Design a protein with these regions (language model features):
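Beta-strand elements within well-structured catalytic alpha/beta cores of enzymes
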Residues: 16-34, 49, 73, 115, ...
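Short catalytic/ligand-binding loop motif for oxyanion handling, primarily in non-cytosolic enzymes
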Residues: 31-33, 66, 82, 130-136, ...
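Active-site-proximal N-terminal segment of extracellular/periplasmic enzymes that hydrolyze or transfer
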Residues: 1-54
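Short secondary-structure boundary/capping segments
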Residues: 39-41, 138-141, 213-216, 253-259, ...
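Secreted, luminal/periplasmic, and some membrane-associated catalytic domains
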Residues: 17-19, 26, 64-65, 89-102, ...
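Low-complexity, glycine/alanine/valine/leucine- and proline-rich hydrophobic stretches
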Residues: 345-405
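His/Asp/Glu-rich, glycine-adjacent segments
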Residues: 74-211, 217, 287-289, 293, ...
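Short, structured active-site-proximal loop/turn typified by the sulfatase FGly-forming signature C/S-X-P-X-R
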Residues: 35-79, 123
Length: 408
């Protein structure tokens, strides 16, 4: 990529990288995780980086789930532009509920692909393979997941035998090791190939189980701090942000606080007449039992939307109940990929479909989850000083703009 040749992607201009840029999306990283870890002496590098560089708290996009936010970060745009409205949605053309992992659902090009096309060397490492195809869409470069690092080929992933390259065993998808593999791979890539731009995306296994400041959480962030320090020592401009925060979703006794919307609507409108979609749904339900703080509802044609909104808003634990138009305007969502009604529950409450459809037997700790406005605040930290307008709203998808355009 020639020096001075800026590129434009989704309405934003980006300068070419002046030094290796590493954007890290720490899944489920409520800002308190960093604050507690620094206070407890677990993140000495981050503490110094926040003091000498840039330390902000910004907003993620809604719903506060993995797919919409990772794609917002790599496109520099909200879901209304890139089209990824959740991890899961109702595809009206196919008439089925589907995982939103196929690049065919992506409506915008990624900055990563454009940078690579302009001649930059680009690498992507993600914890879960569900994100890999979306993040790597159109990308000429390295793109693989920790989850399937034993299956990589030069043709499909830009690197053969990533497991041997990183020098670590294949991690369990339900472990902190899945994220550590991402960091280890990032350091190894920077040491050996020194990409111009690298995107690292972890999993929130630890955050779903452990609150900020607990020993397990601090241990995770201590591990992360060590790898970030090594990337810094290698000369990288580092941006640390998150796809969403995380909160306890329990009552005073530690039991999940759930409002089952499908059961409620079936009892009122008739069984199966309304369809509740939970965009948190993904293949890894042990994390959260497919329970989050955001839902979208498709209603039968003869139903008055205003009546449904009014009754849902009276349910305990509701923060916002909006019609499609207002919800998509407020949350910057594509109207054709959400239902007639959008439901957001408050900080300590999640929404489900039916009691019978949620298996919570895999939860071995009090439920912690995300999806709502209460999980929208995320850290935005750089190891460089930046030009940021005081008081301006910062979004997690400003990460590449900050690293490429605003470093002093």
């Amino acid at each position: 990529m020639s020096e001075g040749s800026a590129i434009e992607v989704n309405g934003r201009r980006y300068a070419p990288p002046r030094a290796p840029v590493v954007v890290v999306c720490v899944d489920g990283c409520e800002p308190d995780y960093l604050d507690c870890a620094v206070e407890h002496g677990a993140m000495s590098w981050l503490g110094a980086a926040r003091a000498a560089g840039t330390s902000l708290v910004g907003d993620c996009v809604m719903p506060s789930f993995t797919n919409p936010n990772n794609l917002s970060i790599v496109t520099g745009a909200p879901p209304s532009v890139h089209g990824i409205s959740g991890n899961y949605f109702w595809d009206p053309q196919a008439g089925v509920e589907v995982m939103m992992n196929d690049p065919k659902y992506l409506r915008a090009e990624t900055l990563l692909a454009r940078l690579a096309a302009a001649g930059a060397t680009v690498a992507v490492v993600t914890a879960k393979d569900k994100l890999r195809r979306l993040l790597g869409h159109g990308l000429k470069g390295i793109c693989f997941s920790s989850e399937k690092a034993d299956e990589t080929t030069e043709t499909e992933h830009g690197i053969a035998d990533a497991l041997r390259f990183v020098g670590r065993p294949l991690p369990s998808v339900y472990s902190a090791n899945l994220s550590e593999f991402v960091f280890a791979a990032g350091v190894r890539l920077m040491e050996t190939r020194r990409p111009d731009v690298m995107y690292l995306s972890t999993t929130d296994y630890v955050q779903h189980k452990h609150a900020p400041g607990t020993p397990a959480a601090d241990a995770f962030y201590r591990m992360m701090d060590g790898y970030l320090a090594r990337l810094d020592a290698l000369g990288a401009i580092i941006v640390l942000t998150a796809d969403h925060g995380m909160n306890a979703k329990t009552d005073a006794a530690g039991r999940p606080r759930v409002v089952y919307l499908q059961d409620f609507l079936d009892a009122w409108l008739g069984e199966g007449r309304a369809r509740v979609i939970l965009p948190i749904t993904d293949p890894y339900v042990v994390h959260h039992g497919a329970l989050g703080s955001f839902a979208t509802i498709y209603l039968p044609a003869d139903t008055r939307v205003d009546d449904v909104i009014e009754r849902l808003a009276r349910l305990p634990g509701m923060e916002a109940v909006l019609d499609r138009k207002e919800g998509c305007r407020r949350f910057e969502l594509p109207e054709d990929r959400v239902g007639d009604v959008i439901v957001v529950s408050e900080r300590a409450t999640v929404v489900g479909t039916s009691v019978a459809r949620h298996d919570l037997s895999g939860l071995d700790a009090p439920l912690r989850s995300h999806g709502g406005l209460s999980e929208q605040r995320v850290p935005v930290v750089l190891n460089r000083r930046t030009r940021v307008t005081p008081g301006a709203r910062v979004r997690n998808f400003d990460a590449f703009d900050l690293a490429l355009n605003r470093v002093v």
